[in-house]
């Protein structure tokens, strides 16, 4: 009796699957482990080796929504420009939706962004910005879209109204609708959409953090990865400030264990210091030895003091690449950066 029941069940399931495929097309439903099933998540490097390791899959996931937020001048746009530069190195097409109208092309070029290949839009309203994003994603020809920033996506009704008019919840409704529309086409087209967001303070919070991000709660739910980026100190050359010490915390991660954090240097005019990261991660992984203020790799002394060691690695590309490969191997990441050593030398 049980075998007859299971045969009937199987028959009913097969006819249901056949009906779904007839109605919605082949591939609209499939077995997770079968052929043409959902593949492993592809990742795109962030330009920071430490952050790639902290994210668990070697970078940010393709075909997902990512949110990067933090206080002013913390390095949000710098980090996304590095993501664009890394994607362009792999031959990807990238777009930058500049709702803040504040992108500096010369700075972007210094970080390695190919301006000739970068698509840029400076929309007038939030609806226009999200419509442009949706069209780019649906085209299937764009690999990465950056929206800078959610706070600057001003709803049309707010722009057309007077300065003092109250428009409670309009921004949140706009974002909520956009997330519902975007999420399916983002997954199908394998395009990553990065939203940069700002921080606001909640009034009257007694316990817990009073900080919140703009645009309501929808983006928090739909994001596969959320990164909190903060400036934690200044980097000085004698009395002159030449960069920021930066901490990034992976607040949410749907593709690997979350809550990891990483620290790196952002140098003014250069971006993320790759050589500084190699030293810090190399010491942690036991690839680089540090005794007192001296850094050494194998039998070779790299330099006395962090800045001297960074200069040595900039000048000796082969040693920098060897250290990077060993760090990647220690964390189980691919050796995909060894072919082009230029990016080590830049920072």
From Swiss-Prot:
Chief location bin: cytoplasm
Entry keyword set: ATP-binding, Cytoplasm, DNA damage, DNA recombination, DNA repair, DNA-binding, Nucleotide-binding, SOS response
A GO molecular function held by the record: ATP hydrolysis activity
Pfam families, per the entry: RecA, RecA_C
GO CC annotation: cytosol
Gene3D superfamilies: P-loop containing nucleotide triphosphate hydrolases
GO biological-process terms attached to the record: DNA recombination; DNA repair; SOS response
Subcellular compartments: Cytoplasm
InterPro entries hit by this protein: AAA+_ATPase, DNA_recomb/repair_RecA, DNA_recomb/repair_RecA_CS, P-loop_NTPase, RecA-like_C, RecA-like_N, RecA_ATP-bd, RecA_C_sf
UniProt keyword annotation of Cytoplasm present: yes
Binding site for ATP: 70-77
SUPFAM superfamilies xref list: P-loop containing nucleoside triphosphate hydrolases (SSF52540), RecA protein, C-terminal domain (SSF54752)
HAMAP family on file: RecA
Protein known as: Protein RecA
Natural source organism: Ruegeria pomeroyi (strain ATCC 700808 / DSM 15171 / DSS-3) (Silicibacter pomeroyi)
């Amino acid at each position: 009796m049980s075998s007859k029941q299971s045969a009937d069940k199987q028959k009913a399931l097969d006819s249901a699957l056949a009906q779904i495929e007839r109605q919605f097309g082949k591939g609209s439903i499939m077995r997770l482990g079968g052929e043409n099933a959902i593949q492993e998540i592809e990742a795109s490097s962030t330009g920071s080796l430490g952050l790639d390791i902290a994210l668990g899959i070697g970078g940010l996931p393709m075909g997902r929504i990512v949110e990067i937020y933090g206080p002013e001048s913390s390095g949000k746009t710098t980090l996304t420009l590095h993501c664009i530069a890394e994607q362009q190195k792999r031959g990807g097409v990238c777009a930058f939706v500049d709702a803040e109208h504040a992108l500096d092309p010369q700075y972007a070029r210094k970080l390695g962004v190919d301006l000739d290949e970068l698509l840029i839009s400076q929309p007038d309203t939030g609806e226009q910005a999200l419509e442009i994003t949706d069209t780019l994603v649906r085209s299937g020809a764009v690999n990465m879209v950056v929206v800078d920033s959610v706070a600057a996506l001003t709803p049309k009704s707010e722009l057309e109204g007077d300065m003092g008019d109250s428009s409670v919840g309009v921004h949140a409704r706009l974002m909520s609708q956009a997330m519902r529309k975007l999420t399916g086409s983002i997954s199908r087209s394998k395009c990553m959409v990065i939203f940069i967001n700002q921080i606001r303070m909640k009034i009257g919070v007694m316990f817990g953090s009073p900080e919140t991000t703009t645009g309501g709660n929808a983006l928090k739910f739909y994001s596969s990865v959320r990164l909190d980026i903060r400036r934690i100190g200044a980097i000085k050359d004698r009395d002159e400030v030449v960069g920021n010490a930066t901490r990034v915390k992976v607040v949410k991660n749907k593709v690997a264990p979350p809550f990891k954090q990483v620290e790196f240097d952002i140098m003014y005019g250069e971006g993320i210091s790759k050589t500084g990261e190699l030293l810090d991660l190399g010491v942690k992984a036991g690839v680089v030895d540090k005794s007192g203020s001296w850094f050494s790799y194998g039998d070779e002394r790299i330099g006395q003091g962090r800045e001297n060691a960074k200069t040595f690695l900039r000048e000796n590309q082969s040693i920098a690449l060897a250290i990077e490969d060993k760090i990647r191997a220690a964390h189980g990441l691919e050796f995909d950066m060894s072919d082009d050593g230029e990016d080590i030398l830049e920072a």
